[in-house]
Amino acid sequence: FRLPTTDELFGDEDLEAGKMNLKPEKSDNVNLSFSYNHQFGKHGLYAEAGLIYRDTKDYIKRGLDVLGGTSYGYYENHGHVRTKGYNLSLLYSFSHWFDIGGTFNSIDTRDYEKFLAGSSLQESMHYKVRMPNLPYRYANINANFYWNDLFVKGNVLSIGYDSYWQHDFPLYWENLGDKDSKNMVPEQFSHNLSLSYTMKNGRYNVSFECRNFTDAQLFDNFSLQKAGRAFYGKFRVFFGK
């Protein structure tokens, strides 16, 4: 079972409308994964592959509507959905100063409600069609450099890079309407950089981050664009023993 989230039930008082009578999702799940982990002297390698199968009733589906010229999201239960997919992960590390890794996910979620809701005779036009407004192929990669005992024993300087890629996907049912004029959530590729200096074995930490340093157009959903290039700084003190 998956209970509805707070936003799904009550909305966010901005761009998400809640629905208080949402039912919990009921799913039968099968997951199969294989992993490999080995250390070759200073070199480390970890690989993992997984298969996913999920049969869901009362699937909580996100939709979009327009009120007064403003788009907003809403949620509703959809009778029957099946999800099949796989994920791949790979991580390489060298000694204690470098690691690089990434993941790739392909998740195919399709409508298996053969007849329209409330009807036992009229067949659905999108039976076995991929669910709309849902990313189905995405990946990420990250790399980190570490300088241990820099300046003072117990201090660590780290520089990190990470990126996220997401395939474009249709806002509405992909089998309806003209392919060339469909509303699409565009392909997205973001890049981030970070710099962190940890002192006194983790008691103090200073970090700086530049998110989306290529200033690419990114979207939370079809109606809400994320911020462009942004810079962040943080200072943390740990008061435990």
Regions found by a protein language model. Name each.
Residues 26-30, 53, 80-84, 133-139, ...:
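Residues that define the transmembrane beta-barrel architecture of outer-membrane proteins
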Residues 5-13, 59-67, 107, 111-121, ...:
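Outer-membrane beta-barrel translocator domains and adjoining extracellular loop/strand segments
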Residues 47, 52-55, 76-170:
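Gram-negative outer-membrane beta-barrel transporters
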Residues 28, 40-43, 57, 95-96, ...:
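Short coil turns and loop connectors of transmembrane beta-barrels in diderm outer membranes
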Residues 1-2, 57, 100, 164-190, ...:
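C-terminal beta-signal and adjacent terminal beta-strands/loops
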Residues 7-9, 31, 44-48, 89, ...:
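Residue-level detector of the transmembrane beta-barrel scaffold of outer-membrane proteins
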Residues 14-22, 71-77, 85-87, 123-131, ...:
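Extracellular loop and loop/strand-boundary signature of outer-membrane beta-barrel proteins
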Residues 24-84:
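Membrane-embedded beta-barrel scaffold of Gram-negative outer-membrane proteins
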